[in-house]
């Protein structure tokens, strides 16, 4: 078989009724002529090289699927604001599992019962044992307060959030999710519960799994479409198979090379692999069509197969190289974008296009050499040239009409692109039958849409925020946030239940003061009679003390007589010194009886008139004025001794002495009388010593001092009575004022209920209880417990731990909204929340704080922001690259400008059709990745067709633009149509994917390619070229150096004009290209089918 293939065969000559021009010799210089000669001499070596390369890479390099699992693509760059804030919040609160969360939905349509709860607890226990894959678990077994939150209102479903290690979409997270899914399935099997896994981690897993399942189906669909189209174009099964063999080999090699790039750190997304397959098939088939069409042209000119292969490769290889370079450079430029899916798909597609290009200029010619020698890929008669020539004539005759009609269609369709609404919810790209979609449906059925998607207002400060002022400022900030439209509730340390803590409002605290004042006012009113009694009692006391003063003055003279008598007795007996001399004192008996009578009378009077001493002493004891006055204090001491003498029997002993003196009789023996008096007198002397009366002079002075103190007390009591009366009058007035104050404060409590009117204050002592580590409920003062609003200490500590970081420098608030967290409205709300929070910062304790919002809506918002930025970058970069290549190729300015404009309008029109089909007809929003990705591909591929069309027009316009347009449309129409159909078929093959984003992108790409093929390149651009005329090739003189032409040698004027203006039709159709003319080598009549 090999020998047969190696034998040269003679290719059939064209029809004899067609005159042909002799072929010019092909130049030997350049890469492609040398490459053509090598391939013709050694086709088996080239084929063996590709087979060996594929055979070497396939077993030694991991598959692209495996690499995509190891190196997944992160949606956002690592320095995205939301990711930075999330990491900071996670570090501040020492949490894990916030980046990647899966939600287990456990449901029972009959209602949750005891058996369901046992299954729930068993599942929780199993998950807690898996410490490698579960870093966070929010269950109501260990945290009973979560039961209400985690249970649906219809009591038919529970949710169980599970935090996984690693970032969302990372290899670690994916592997952990797979193992957690196995645990859930195993534990719930056989129970009455139905378990569904959903949440962000489940969505990412389903995206990857669905992409892998779709790939084989997509590749099969693309292959079938290509076979049909190639069979229609060539009508030859062998010719049809050659491009497929080339593409298949290049796909194997390209995937392994991309896998090597993945091992070097390039992220690989399953969606990117799908687009990579479609792009390789489309571009590879286009290049094969270019080469085979030029090969057929040379065969028609009488060349044998080997010569045709060399000439076709020499001429069209440069076109393929320029086209591939344009596409590859454009794709590689996407590495400067920010979003992961765009940043990684660019290098993947760039590598793929490069591999396809090398296969198209090496492997495909080698296959053509072997099959062409046997005549297996001979051309058939061209059936389309007459149609395209007629089309060119119509355009030249009525360029304005054609331009207006085509432009009107394009502009109307492009206008629809401005009505696009973009979707950032990856849930909608998944089919409804996957696990995560079923779980989301269960969530939507039983729970609010925003329940499992937390959104936080995160505040970071360089100072400790656990102060009354900082908390008051925080409350004012979140109060503003709570007023943002769509915000349903804000929960945090200052508002645990979603509204400002009532007991911390200053209006509530003022109301409590008012309540106490009201109670005091009522007490004053109730005890007004008692106050009046106080005033009367003070006046009565003052009157009585006046009477006491009179009694004291009278008693003082009597006491003085008693003291004189006792002093006389002491002098008479001589005290202890004269005890032995009493035997000679009988003569004194009479005097003693008389003295006894006097002592008895005076002692009795004193004893009967000391009743005034007790109240006076009590008044003096309670008088601060007497305590401060040394004289009054001394008198008080003496008066205390007098009262003590009365109470302890001293005065009674004096009376006993008097009675003994009175009982002296003549018949009594002196010894007995004196013996009795001796004992009584000794007792009296000791008692008087205790009273400080051992010295008669001292007693007299002290009695006088008491007299003075009593006088002063009587005078002060009157002043006291007047002061008490004044106090009573003031208390009555204060009671009236307290009533008015309490009424005002209570009214403030009742009416100042809005946060703006209420104020906020939490005592620092309460903060220390909330953030302390060893606080017990019984140690907290009752006034602080009153401020908790029904929370106990443990609950307060949990609230503080949830919303205040351990160091106090970070605080967060949980935001609940009425919006779908995946919607664009929720993304737009982020800016409003941030603006409201930052607007409350100036001139507060939060002035230097960093305020950010964390949550899925913020992730989607950042995705949108980066997408908009990347789209602008892609547009600018792609336009510049393609424009530069066109300027270099055409050596002109005007034509490249309107060509770029046509590309952009074509892209917008394709996007507009996508909006009409998906948004208006199917009710689906366009996926956010569609604009950027489709722009690059449509503009880059459109650049191929631009090169084919405008380069040939530049060549044919030597004899006039109008005739050049006719010849260009006639010669390139079939090639552009075939290439466009093949590329569109490759893109439409992606419509068989299950991912909505891939389906939308494929439809827009396929539609855009068809628009570009059948409208823009064949009607709009030729019409513009006719209207612009020779100005198409205008170039500033400074850009025209004599030898300037980087892609090849320029011809002189004589060479450009030596071709006859008119040729017979047959000769014109069969005339070969000038071998030394670069433009002719690129796009001459031989490029037709």
From Swiss-Prot:
GO terms for biological process: cell wall organization; lipid transport; sulfolipid biosynthetic process. It is a multi-pass membrane protein. Residues 1066-1078 have a biased composition (Acidic residues). One of its GO terms (cellular component) is plasma membrane. Pfam families: MMPL. It comes from the Bacteria. The keyword Cell inner membrane applies. Belongs to the resistance-nodulation-cell division (RND) (TC 2.A.6) family. MmpL subfamily. Required for the biosynthesis and the transport across the inner membrane of sulfolipid-1 (SL-1), which is a major cell wall lipid of pathogenic mycobacteria. Could also transport SL1278 (2-palmitoyl-3-(C43)-phthioceranyl-alpha, alpha'-D-trehalose-2'-sulfate), which is the precursor of SL-1. Required for virulence. This is Sulfolipid-1 exporter MmpL8.
């Amino acid at each position: 078989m090999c020998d047969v293939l190696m034998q040269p065969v003679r290719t059939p000559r064209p029809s004899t009724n067609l005159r042909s021009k002799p072929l010019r010799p092909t130049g030997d210089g350049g890469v492609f002529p040398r490459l053509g000669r090598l391939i013709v001499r050694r086709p088996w070596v080239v084929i063996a090289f590709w087979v060996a390369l594929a055979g070497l890479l396939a077993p030694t390099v991991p598959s692209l699927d495996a690499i995509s699992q190891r190196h997944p693509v992160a949606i956002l760059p690592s320095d995205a604001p939301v990711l930075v804030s999330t990491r900071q919040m996670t570090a501040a609160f020492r949490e894990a599992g916030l980046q990647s969360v899966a939600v287990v939905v456990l449901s029972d349509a009959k209602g949750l019962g005891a058996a369901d709860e046992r299954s729930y607890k068993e599942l929780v226990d199993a998950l807690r044992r898996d410490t490698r894959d579960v870093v966070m678990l929010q269950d109501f077994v260990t945290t009973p307060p979560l039961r209400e939150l985690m249970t649906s209102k219809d009591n038919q479903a529970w949710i169980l959030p599970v935090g996984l290690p690693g970032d969302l979409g990372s290899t670690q997270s994916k592997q952990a999710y797979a193992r957690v899914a196995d645990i859930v399935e195993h534990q719930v099997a056989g129970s009455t519960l139905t378990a569904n896994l959903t949440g962000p981690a489940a969505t990412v897993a389903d995206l990857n799994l669905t992409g892998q399942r779709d790939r084989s189906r997509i590749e099969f669909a693309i292959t079938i479409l290509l076979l049909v189209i190639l069979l229609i174009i060539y009508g030859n099964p062998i010719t049809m198979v050659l491009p497929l063999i080339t593409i298949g080999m290049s796909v194997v090699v390209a995937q392994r090379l991309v896998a090597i790039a993945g091992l070097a750190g390039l992220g690989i997304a399953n969606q990117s692999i799908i687009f990579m397959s479609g792009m390789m098939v489309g571009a590879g088939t286009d290049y094969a069509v270019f080469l085979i069409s030029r090969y057929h042209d040379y065969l028609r000119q009488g060349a044998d197969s080997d010569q045709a292969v060399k000439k076709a490769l020499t001429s069209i290889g440069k076109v393929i190289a320029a086209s591939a370079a344009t596409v590859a450079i454009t794709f590689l430029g996407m590495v400067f974008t920010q979003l992961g899916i765009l940043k990684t798909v660019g290098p993947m597609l760039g590598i793929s296009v490069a591999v396809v290009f090398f296969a198209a200029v090496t492997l495909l010619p080698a296959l053509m050499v072997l099959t062409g020698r046997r005549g297996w890929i001979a051309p058939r008669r061209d059936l389309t040239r007459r149609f395209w020539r007629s089309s060119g004539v119509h355009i030249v005759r009525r360029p304005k009409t054609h331009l207006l009609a085509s432009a009107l269609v394009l502009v109307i369709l492009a206008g629809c692109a401005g009505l696009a609404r973009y979707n950032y919810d990856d849930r909608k790209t998944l089919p409804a039958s996957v696990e995560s979609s079923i779980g989301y449906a269960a969530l939507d059925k039983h729970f609010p849409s925003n329940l499992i998607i937390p959104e936080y207002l995160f505040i970071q400060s360089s100072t400790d925020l656990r102060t009354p002022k900082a908390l008051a400022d925080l409350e004012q900030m979140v109060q503003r946030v709570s007023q943002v439209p769509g915000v349903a509730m804000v929960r945090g340390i200052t508002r645990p239940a979603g509204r400002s803590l009532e007991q911390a409002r200053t209006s509530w605290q003022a109301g409590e003061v008012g309540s106490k004042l009201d109670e005091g006012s009522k007490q004053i009113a109730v005890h007004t009679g008692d106050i009046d009694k106080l005033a009367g009692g003070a006046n009565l006391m003052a009157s009585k003390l006046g009477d006491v003063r009179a009694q004291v003055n009278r008693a003082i003279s009597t006491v003085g007589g008693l003291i004189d008598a006792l002093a006389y007795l002491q002098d008479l007996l001589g005290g202890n010194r004269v005890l032995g001399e009493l035997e000679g004192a009988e003569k004194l008996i009479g005097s003693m009886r008389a003295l006894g009578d006097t002592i008895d009378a005076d002692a009795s009077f004193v004893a009967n008139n000391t009743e005034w001493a007790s109240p006076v002493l009590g008044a003096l004891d309670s008088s601060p004025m007497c305590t401060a006055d040394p004289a009054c204090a001394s008198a008080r001491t003496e008066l205390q001794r007098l009262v003590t003498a009365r109470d302890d029997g001293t005065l009674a002993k004096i009376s006993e002495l008097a009675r003994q003196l009175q009982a002296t009789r003549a018949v009594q023996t002196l010894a007995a009388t004196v013996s009795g008096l001796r004992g009584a007198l000794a007792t009296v002397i000791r008692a008087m010593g205790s009273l400080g009366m051992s010295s008669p002079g001292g007693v007299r002075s002290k009695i006088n001092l008491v007299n003075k103190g009593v006088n002063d007390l009587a005078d002060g009591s009157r002043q006291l009575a007047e002061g008490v009366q004044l106090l009573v009058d003031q208390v009555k007035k204060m009671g009236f004022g307290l009533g008015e104050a309490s009424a005002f404060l209570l009214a403030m409590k009742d009416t100042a209920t809005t946060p703006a009117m209420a104020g906020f204050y939490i005592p620092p002592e309460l903060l220390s209880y909330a953030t302390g580590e060893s606080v017990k409920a019984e140690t907290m003062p009752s006034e602080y417990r009153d401020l908790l609003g029904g929370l106990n200490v443990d609950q307060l500590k949990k609230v503080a731990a949830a919303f205040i970081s351990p160091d106090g420098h970070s605080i967060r608030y949980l935001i609940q909204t009425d919006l779908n967290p995946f919607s664009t409205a929720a993304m737009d709300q982020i800016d409003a929340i941030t603006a409201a929070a930052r607007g409350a910062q100036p001139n507060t304790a939060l002035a230097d704080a960093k305020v950010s919002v964390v949550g899925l809506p913020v992730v989607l918002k950042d995705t949108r922001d980066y997408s908009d930025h990347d789209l602008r970058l892609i547009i600018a970069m792609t336009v510049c690259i393609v424009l530069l290549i066109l300027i270099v190729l055409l050596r002109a300015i005007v034509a490249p400008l309107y060509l770029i404009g046509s590309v952009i309008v074509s892209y917008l029109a394709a996007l507009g059709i996508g909006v009409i089909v998906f948004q208006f007809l199917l009710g689906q929003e366009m996926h956010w990745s569609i604009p950027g990705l489709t722009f690059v591909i449509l503009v880059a591929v459109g650049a191929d067709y631009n090169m084919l069309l405008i380069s040939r027009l530049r060549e044919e316009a030597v004899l006039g633009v109008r005739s050049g347009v006719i010849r260009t449309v006639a010669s390139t129409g079939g090639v552009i149509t075939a290439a466009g159909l093949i590329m569109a078929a490759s893109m439409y093959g992606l419509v068989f994917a299950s991912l909505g984003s891939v389906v939308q992108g494929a439809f827009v790409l396929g539609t855009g390619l068809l628009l570009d093929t059948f409208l823009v390149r064949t009607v709009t651009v030729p019409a513009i070229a006719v209207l612009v005329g020779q100005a198409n090739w205008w170039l500033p003189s400074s850009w025209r150096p004599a030898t300037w032409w980087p892609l090849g040698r320029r011809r002189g004027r004589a060479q450009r004009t030596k071709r006859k203006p008119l040729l017979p039709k047959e000769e014109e159709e069969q005339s070969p290209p000038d071998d030394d003319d670069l433009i002719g080598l690129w796009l001459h009549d031989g490029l037709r089918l």
